[in-house]
Amino acid sequence: MQTKTLEALLIEANELVKRLSYDESIDLINNTQTVIIDVREESEVYNLGIIKNAIHIPRGLIEFKLLPNSPNNPVLINDDTNILVYCAGGYRSALAAKSLLDLGFKNVFNLGGFQEWVESGGEIQPNV
């Protein structure tokens, strides 16, 4: 059986999903229809907060929650919506963004890591 390494999966994801800079992210957020998705674990969100206006969907649930016919889908995403995905360091978000592309979503981007966002001056809010 041929298997892929995690490194190979990340390389593939990073080739398909653009990782945005902070400035590119802010431009999309301010000027387009954008959904920000936090794929970190509940404890990470609880302890550190969340990017302002982001939706929390843990990495392990993203494919289930964002299916168009899912009764648990928290957001309406159309073809014009930009989807920005982030985690703690940019690895889980790369894999999650690749999964969203595989599901047929368009305009999916890797926002990178939460700490990177905070260090760049990005707005956050406590987990609500």
Regions found by a protein language model. Give the residues of each.
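Rhodanese-like catalytic fold shared by cysteine-dependent sulfurtransferases
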Residues: M1-T34, E42-N82, Y91-V128
